[in-house]
Amino acid sequence: MGFRLRNVPLLSRVGADRADHLRTDLDAALEGWAEAVVLRVDERSQVMVVDEQVVLSPAAELGDSPPGNGVFLGRLPDGRHAWAVRAPLQAPDGVPARVIDPRRAGVPFDDVSAQLVTCALALLNWHDAAGFSPADGSPTRPIRGGWARRNLLTGHEEFPRVDPAVICLVHDGHDRAVLARQVVWPPRLFSLLAGFVEAGESFETCVAREIYEEIGLDVTDVTYLGSQPWPFPRSLMVGFHALADPEQEFSFNDGEIAEAAWFTRDEVCEALAHGDWGSDSTSRLLLPGSISIAREIIESWAFHA
């Protein structure tokens, strides 16, 4: 049974112009700063939201020009420039804002907010770990609006690292799919199987290897579905579905999976109706929230006609 994603995964949605040509145009950056807005991300990678929109504060509050730790996110639909900084959160006056951890957010962002938060986290997390060159240990400094760093000794430019990982829904081609729980997860929390791509490995080969290593099943017909950035701290999740035989026994070979089982479509639909991992439901099966491509893949399979 083939199926497609019903919707673009939340963190893959585009609501703003990345405006990469402005990253090296210092004059344009300075000219736009007076009307620009800033997304604050605190040390715990939390942000503030009002309804489905992330809180953006006036850039001028930070000074007359972009700070050294600022990263340029792009241009909003109304033309204003958007930046991000690692800084304490500030709620706007008279607005009921709340602090959220994007990784655990249960309420979807609008498209603009999703793009800004994803981009901000990916860049800021990289800068936190990239103060020194991996080649010679020399200090580096941000350039290109925060989209690169330059080695102060050699002048070599370094760019954000992205770690690709696969995530796959294994099904029988009919009415059953495999869901699994990692050892570190509490009881009742299940999701899809996932793992990082190794050097010299294709996505499809990685899917087959990871599933065999984690639960001992052989898969065929590995089919691409879609992808989603996962900036926690720097992954790109590449989604697939694949076929397996329900008669083949599970074996938990690498110690990462505590349990796995075949669930019927009706069981999965019932679990989806009970919310997600953050729900207070007593359901025996709780599934990931909308922030993850796992949810979109599961829903797309469950509701496929």
Label each residue range with its predicted role.
Residues R149-S191, F196, D218-V219, A244:
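N-terminal strand-loop-strand
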Residues S191-L225, F240:
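The catalytic Nudix box helix
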Residues G145, V162-D163, S191, R234-S235, ...:
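Short glycine/proline-enriched turns and hinge-like loops at secondary-structure junctions
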